[in-house]
Amino acid sequence: MTELTIDVRGLTKAYGGRRVVDAVDMQVATGRIVGFLGPNGSGKTTSLRMLCGLLTPDAGEGRVLGLDFRREAAAVKRQVGYMTQKFGLYEDLSIRENLDFIARLFSMPDRRAAVDAALQRLGLATRQQQLAGALSGGWKQRLALAACLLHRPRLLLLDEPTAGVDPKARREFWDQIHRLAGEGITVLVSTHYMDEAERCHELVYIAYGSVLARGTAASIVAEAGARDLEDAFVRLVGRANDNFGQAG
């Protein structure tokens, strides 16, 4: 039987009477890379924040990493690495100081060794004294991922991690993601890039807070009767606009 890192049903969140996430079901098998796609404002970030325990859902039940994601949110947070859309570390601290600060937050007894390992893994060791604010987008991305990995999470939730990053840095980032998945770490990643979506094992497409399609890239293209993945999502968005837009 397949082990599920995420097994959640009916995930729901509303603001001002409008459901931004509407009864979303999410099942992600351990060690898989799942792409989370959809237009801006479709509910991706809100869903990720609920799954990692940062935001309380209005409804929904299930488990994340074997824990009740609502009742045991604090325990879930300790085992998840969450990378936000915007760079969230301290720009006036060095690379090493940022990582050391994160390690202290997690009360890691082997703090120095953990920081050294993260620096080596992400190719940051030779730059560790540089201020974070002086880094390019690609190097900031590496630092943010290093911070996510410090406490050895079993699940990574990545919110548009490569937005605004050059193609070479994006490719290197995805090579790293596949290495992590090979080590048994589960990855749920939101993206707008079709080439990145094709590197995922499975995809979930959301619009107006509801899941419109899920499956492999090939199965989604076939079911949509599309030429390629980009064409499939154009068709899905069009249908969503017709159905949900008129209802709104």
Q: What is each PLM-predicted segment?
A:
Residues 92, 131-135:
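Conserved ABC ATPase signature
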Residues 100, 104-127:
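Conserved ABC ATPase "signature" region
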Residues 152:
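Conserved catalytic motifs of ABC-family nucleotide-binding domains
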Residues 156-160:
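Catalytic Walker B motif of ABC-type/P-loop ATPase nucleotide-binding domains
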Residues 214-215:
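ABC ATPase "signature
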